[in-house]
Amino acid sequence: MGYARKVGWVTAGLVIGAGACYCIYRLTRGRKQNKEKMAEGGSGDVDDAGDCSGARYNDWSDDDDDSNESKSIVWYPPWARIGTEAGTRARARARARATRARRAVQKRASPNSDDTILSPQELQKVLCLVEMSEKPYILEAALIALGNNAAYAFNRDIIRDLGGLPIVAKILNTRDPIVKEKALIVLNNLSVNAENQRRLKVYMNQVCDDTITSRLNSSVQLAGLRLLTNMTVTNEYQHMLANSISDFFRLFSAGNEETKLQVLKLLLNLAENPAMTRELLRAQVPSSLGSLFNKKENKEVILKLLVIFENINDNFKWEENEPTQNQFGEGSLFFFLKEFQVCADKVLGIESHHDFLVKVKVGKFMAKLAEHMFPKSQE
């Protein structure tokens, strides 16, 4: 009896063990199959384009026989979009998948053409994807296609007439930095058109706030600065940035070289407009601004900054502004320029400081500043 019971327990153990092994086998086999499906662009539940005609994600495919990587769009696993500190994807293979997604969007919009320039009907399909999709990698691929086409003048009117401006601008509300950057690039390319600028002005405050609050030196911040620079090429919309000039000087002082140069392009647009002179002089500037005039700073940065100061000096009318000097608070650009002699002495007094051109520019600017903006007889 005892022997039979023992055999029964052993048999039960074998059955349970076999069942467990089978379950593990099924589980691992299922995971493997899922991965293979994702790698091969399996149909899956990835229909993300709603009722938009022809915009079915699981219908996208690339039938080129020359390349195995262009079979179809690849679904991103959840971990593929984990960002690093720089806002890029952590896994290198995600970049390759994004490339395949972009090709699939192009193929879907224009299946019979390898040309990157899309027709109005094809642009409508891409805009439909942007409007209906919630998948970041689909949005990114579609926005890249739009941005490339928005670089052509004839397409800017077409995209606007198709209702593309508000569709792309809506993407600015996303929290995904990669998608947001691509949306800003599209709007930047579209903003070269005067009529597009008129319609995009309603988004300037949002773009300005997002640019200032974005992570310092990030791709989103640079894309936002480029869009704002394009929007301020003419004087028509510059006044909308008047309350943010202090923030731009803060970005200039704290940013890296690329950020500094982009901020300078924006400030130069404002400085060329006499109507913005008072707003620029009223802006609060960081105390560290003077430290930029040292031998370690990029020469191009210093020369561009001097051009901005010269424009402000040329547009400033002492006789008109003398009674209102008290409107310029302590720490403003007005008082920085008034005390600029200290910075100039550092540049002119060190033989090893920069090159001859910088010294000449600083010397000429100091002479103009003393003659025009702060004449000694008036101090």
UniProtKB/Swiss-Prot annotation:
Region feature (Mitochondrion outer membrane (MOM)-targeting sequence): 1-6, 26-37
- State the family named in the UniProt similarity comment for this chain: Belongs to the eutherian X-chromosome-specific Armcx family.
> From what superkingdom does this record's organism come?
Eukaryota
Bilayer topology term: Single-pass membrane protein
Keywords per UniProt: Cytoplasm, Membrane, Mitochondrion, Mitochondrion outer membrane, Nucleus, Phosphoprotein, Repeat, Signal-anchor, Transmembrane, Transmembrane helix
Species in which this protein is naturally found: Pongo abelii
Protein name in UniProt: Armadillo repeat-containing X-linked protein 3
- Those parts of the protein on the Mitochondrial intermembrane side are 1-6
* Pfam families, alphabetized: Arm_2 (PF04826)
Question: What is its quaternary makeup?
Answer: Interacts (via ARM domain) with MIRO1, MIRO2 and TRAK2. The interaction with Miro is calcium-dependent. Interacts with SOX10.
Nuclear localization signal: annotated span: 89-98
